[in-house]
């Protein structure tokens, strides 16, 4: 039986931050061009893993699918916390 009282360490394959940033910028721009609420669509994708939240236009869907959702979330949280310090 596992002990759920211990904190597990999370690790993932390191992807350059600029790659994550450029993909998110392209996805955001594409969603806005299509008239969607970009933040809601990205959150929907991150929570569900369903690529249908992201359009195929500008290769946005293909690009975001090549980055693990965990990596995207780590980058978003990291940047949010950096910004909130200022």
From Swiss-Prot:
Pfam families xref list: IreB
InterPro entries: IreB
Secretion signal span: none
UniProt cross-references to PANTHER family, sorted A to Z: UPF0297 PROTEIN YRZL (PTHR40067:SF1)
Similarity-based family: Belongs to the UPF0297 family.
Protein name per UniProt: UPF0297 protein SERP1181
UniProt organism field: Staphylococcus epidermidis (strain ATCC 35984 / DSM 28319 / BCRC 17069 / CCUG 31568 / BM 3577 / RP62A)
